[in-house]
Amino acid sequence: MSEIQLRHDWKRDEIEALFALPMNDLLFEAHSIHRQVYDPNEVQISRLLSIKTGACPEDCKYCPQSARYDTGLEKERLIEIEKVLTEARSAKAAGASRFCMGAAWRNPHARDMPYLKDMVREVKSMGMETCMTLGMLSPDQAGELAEAGLDYYNHNLDTSPEYYGDIITTRTYQDRLDTLSNVRAAGMKVCSGGIVGMGEQATDRSGLLQQLANMEQHPDSVPINMLVKVAGTPFENLEDLDPLVFVRTIAVARILMPHSRVRLSAGREKMSDEMQAMCFFAGANSIFYGCKLLTTNNPEENEDMTLFKRLGLHPEQGKYATIEDDKAVFEKATAKANAIKDKQSSAFYDAAAL
């Protein structure tokens, strides 16, 4: 098999041509590349905690954490460090290798930085990788977090540059690119992806992946989120995205960015086991683990581990999460999969989802 060539000069029409391939051809190409770089049966597991919820001043149309929309979400202040550590211990015990902390901010304030750095240091002392998503970062803030030991910083591009203005007006596309540049310059790893199912056109999905793949250095982690339509947000009544379009997006991301972790992110709660299996085959090799993604639902741990067992997958580093390996748990997960099999629907990505 030929050696994989990393490219940073993808043209839009080249990417659109990949999306247009017959499904079997696309999946074959993506999976072949995936096998060359990664163990195809290993999935990296992260746990995500909202450390500050709601009252965000931004106007992202998909997000229930925006103060501009009445979604019934109760806002919370920055939580105490000990609560963060309790959640991190639980995550590690359940098999997560990375702990992600998200805050619904436009950007962190100077008064927040000491607490954030302490969170990073304490979680790292447990032997876990750390990730944060706090909004925009200045070069100095990125440097402070890097010095504290933060491994990853998430800041998504959300969609293509052309469609971006229809999604958010309070932060520019260049603002997002600048934050990613600050993160990379500080020596941290970049986590950046986007959301599909927001009413975008096919060319916008190509445009999003083009932006990511043409960065000077590919993101280390690329989360692909499916919109979860939340009542009270402007996007609550959008039509569902075809599940196979989502699978195609995963596959094209794997082809364009062979060495990046492609994360099957928000939206798994509404995906059938069969759809998730196709995503793993297409090149997804990272998930969020636990019953919540910031403010939205996520499959329970035992359901994920039951699915892993059925598919012959294992968590990164070969560490299995705790699972009640009994008939009742298996039957519960199977029943849920059957119940939603014919109800494929879009799922939601939060403002700080990774």
Curated annotation (Swiss-Prot):
Belongs to the radical SAM superfamily. Biotin synthase family. Homodimer. PROSITE patterns: RADICAL_SAM (PS51918). Pathway: Cofactor biosynthesis; biotin biosynthesis; biotin from 7,8-diaminononanoate: step 2/2. Its EC number is 2.8.1.6. Catalyzes the conversion of dethiobiotin (DTB) to biotin by the insertion of a sulfur atom into dethiobiotin via a radical-based mechanism. [2Fe-2S] cluster binds at C100, C131, C191, R263. One of its GO terms (biological process) is biotin biosynthetic process. Binds 1 [4Fe-4S] cluster. The cluster is coordinated with 3 cysteines and an exchangeable S-adenosyl-L-methionine. Binds 1 [2Fe-2S] cluster. The cluster is coordinated with 3 cysteines and 1 arginine. Its cofactor is [4Fe-4S] cluster; [2Fe-2S] cluster. It catalyses: (4R,5S)-dethiobiotin + (sulfur carrier)-SH + 2 reduced [2Fe-2S]-[ferredoxin] + 2 S-adenosyl-L-methionine = (sulfur carrier)-H + biotin + 2 5'-deoxyadenosine + 2 L-methionine + 2 oxidized [2Fe-2S]-[ferredoxin]. It comes from the Bacteria. NCBIfam families: bioB. The keyword DNA damage does not apply. SUPFAM superfamilies: Radical SAM enzymes. [4Fe-4S] cluster binds at C56, C60, C63. InterPro entries: Aldolase_TIM, BATS_dom, Biotin_synth/BioAB, Biotin_synthase, Elp3/MiaA/NifB-like_rSAM, rSAM. The gene is bioB. Residues 41-265 form the Radical SAM core domain. GO terms for molecular function: 2 iron, 2 sulfur cluster binding; 4 iron, 4 sulfur cluster binding; biotin synthase activity; iron ion binding. This is Biotin synthase. Keywords: 2Fe-2S, 4Fe-4S, Biotin biosynthesis, Iron, Iron-sulfur, Metal-binding, S-adenosyl-L-methionine, Transferase.
